[in-house]
């Protein structure tokens, strides 16, 4: 307790007169007043400095206060002309809507030409302050508040924090609806600039945008981003979610930025574009719209959740990192080069393959929704680890291709290419549902021999319909007679409306192989046969002899032999040459007589199967 007034007399020019008052046990009671004379300075740092008398600050005198560390009360407080009130606003933990610096029983009088000066070491040099100090409406308190909440024309939403400095905002930020705002601020958007760190440790309610231009923004409470419309992260900026859940409308991040999920949960109601880095663990949930990810996220080990009606688009393995994908909407994998998909993908959503590259999937592909191969190739597993894709519907578009080992659990629609060929024949692709041909192409490899020749096969457990072209590559074999043929397509269900059409000629040795539907109980299957007809299998019946498909070139071989046999036939007289004689009358040498050889032949032949017929006409003169 101090009894009496404290007076700092006026001092001459270049003199000093300073007083520092600190509180003891959070309270300093002075039974008197405080008069600060011309040129003198008083530093008050007590949180509860109470003067029972009056406080006056003369011309060129100053009072120095710190926000959060000073709360000075007096009967009356007067700041005279050209007096100075210096306020340090460098409070690191802003946990109140406002801080009271001065309070008075009867009022605070501030001369028009007095000076209230704020300084803040947390601010980047030259930056606008986020703090505003003024009298309250009753003129009995001098308070400092966040300019965010100022409704008198100075509202401001930018926090420009100096490098290595940290500011924690622990009060809730709501929309400032005042028509008078500073420097074009919309009253509802937060901007973090400067290379320092801003922490939002309260649940907020603002509805504008959140933009991190530089430095770090740390979220230390649920919904610290309020109801943010757009979240912008500029190059070099970082957002640390610090384990808390947040919901925003749209995410827009630039290359070189970092979004650290850090065990938190970020919900996007309208997708966005992510060119920066996503790191940490936790979850990123897409409730609606499309999120297009192009950044390197190899350090993200969390979960992407794509909800119904939402869309996630990625183009490289790094875009997904090592994250799981729980897909109930649409996932687009746009690969322009080879991509071994190692991420676990589940859910009943649809998967779209675009881009000219090949996508190789293994047993981590657990989705059950539709798979649409629009461009490029989807490769199922490998020879040692075949994959049965769980999709209920696989669509191969005109520029798409399905290949590999295993099959699809559901239906298959083919407008593009289904490629069963590998390094050797014998691959089997299984369709668990129905197959629909839409003028697509099936590629097979076959050894051209008898019925038991090695071949690739398409096995359809359900029904088959539509038209499909089939191209067969010969993989060895010298040709042989077939009985039923080499089965290449097997349909367990109905195939009445299916048509598989051979695209190119298949020859081996003396045989032509053709693709033909089976007969009788085999009428739902397609075979490569070297026979003209497939017999209808009868129980306990002995197969009849049937003619095989002979190559038409054989007829030309026979005709060539016949021509060669006639071409060089001559007679004895021709071999002897012409006879010469000398005329008795003239003594000249002459040729004797005339000689001619004329021979013609006509022949016809055919094989006993009547497949090959040849006719030859030969004339020799």
Language-model-detected regions and their locations in the chain:
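Outer membrane beta-barrel translocator domains of Type V secretion systems
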Residues: 199, 537-621
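Short secondary-structure subsegments characteristic of cysteine-rich extracellular domains
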Residues: 213-214, 479-494, 610-621
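Extracellular/periplasmic ectodomains of large secreted or surface enzymes and adhesion receptors
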Residues: 127-131, 136-181, 186-191
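Extracellular beta-solenoid/beta-roll
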Residues: 1-81, 98-125, 200, 234, ...
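Secreted peptidase-domain scaffold signal
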Residues: 169, 273-274
